[in-house]
Regions:
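Ligand-binding face of N-terminal immunoglobulin V-set domains in extracellular IgSF glycoproteins
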Residues: 52-56, 100-105, 110-122, 127-132
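Surface-exposed binding patches on compact interaction domains or structured appendages
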Residues: 31-38, 62-116, 207, 214-219
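Terminal connector regions
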Residues: 72-74, 119-166, 245-276
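Bacterial N-terminal signal peptides that target proteins for export
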Residues: 2-17
Length: 276
């Protein structure tokens, strides 16, 4: 693989990792104790320009292990459901992606840098390329299939970490509009939520928090759900009560008064509301 070229990354939160267990029957050959950073990539570029990036794969286990790496397509619905697709989906940009290798050997309690490149063809239209890099631990019997390119998401795996990659081409950006803030009933419990529309051509997210006080005088923060709002979507996102120490706050007593600012990449929304 050639040396990666510089990239331009949009602001993002501190990197964390998510372990998604995906056992589908059978016994586990070994614990899947892997961490990956960053948790996602938010990049910008243009057609005809190669972008290089790297992630760190950390083995937290006291024994050496091997993981496999591949790309997958994904979709996040307006209702908040994520789906993964091994087959190329319409408009997929995965053919633009070159991975350093199919598998990585990790030493006990050690780390490896893993490189990948994205090369959008010249003349690619403005928009957002989205895919995930899947780092998987698998049963030994499945290693040959994966390395031979014959793996599918239906194979039993001991674990998977999926790292989202977003590439905004030729200035693609979100355009968010906060349409509503209200209290609603969900699963028999009251919650506070905001409805946000994205009329842009790249994904967006809400950040920031609101200061809130309930009818019993208890103060807490309301923090927006940090999941993506894809282009063309209108999503209702929960505002989660959070205590000063960062832990979940008790269920508030209504009415609740809330004020403050919710931020997104290109702006912010000033909020002042009484929620019954």
């Amino acid at each position: 693989m050639t040396q990666p070229s510089p990239t331009h990354a949009l602001p993002r939160r501190t990197a964390t990792f998510i372990l998604l267990l995906a056992g589908a029957g059978g016994t586990l050959a070994a614990p899947f104790e892997i961490a990956v950073s960053p948790s996602r990539f938010e990049l910008s570029g243009r057609g005809g320009t190669r972008l290089g990036q790297s992630l760190e794969i950390h083995n937290l286990a006291p024994v050496a292990t091997e993981v496999t790496v591949r790309t997958i397509d994904w979709h996040y619905s307006a209702e908040g459901q994520i789906s993964y697709h091994d087959d190329l989906q319409p408009g997929s940009c995965r053919p633009w992606v070159a991975l350093e290798r199919r598998s990585v050997q990790l030493p006990a309690r050690g780390s490896r840098a893993y490189r990948f490149q994205i090369e959008p063809p010249a003349g690619s239209p403005r928009g957002e390329c989205r895919f995930m890099i899947a780092i998987e631990g698998s049963e030994p019997a499945q290693q040959a299939l994966i390395q031979g390119g014959g793996a599918s998401l239906s194979l039993p795996v001991t674990g998977r970490i999926a790292v989202a990659v977003y590439l905004a081409l030729d200035g693609a950006e979100p355009r968010l509009d906060l349409q509503r803030i209200a209290s609603t009933d969900s699963g028999g419990q009251r919650r506070i939520a905001v409805t946000v529309a994205n009329t842009g051509d790249a994904h967006g997210r809400l950040e920031g928090s609101l200061e809130a006080v309930d009818s019993q005088g208890r103060a807490f923060a309301l923090v927006p759900e940090g999941t993506p709002i894809l282009p063309g979507q209108t999503r209702t996102l929960a505002l989660m009560p959070q205590a000063e120490d960062g832990r979940a706050a008790p269920q508030p007593a209504y009415p609740v008064k809330a004020e403050g600012t919710l931020d997104w990449a290109q702006g912010s929304f000033k909020v002042e509301a009484t929620l019954e």
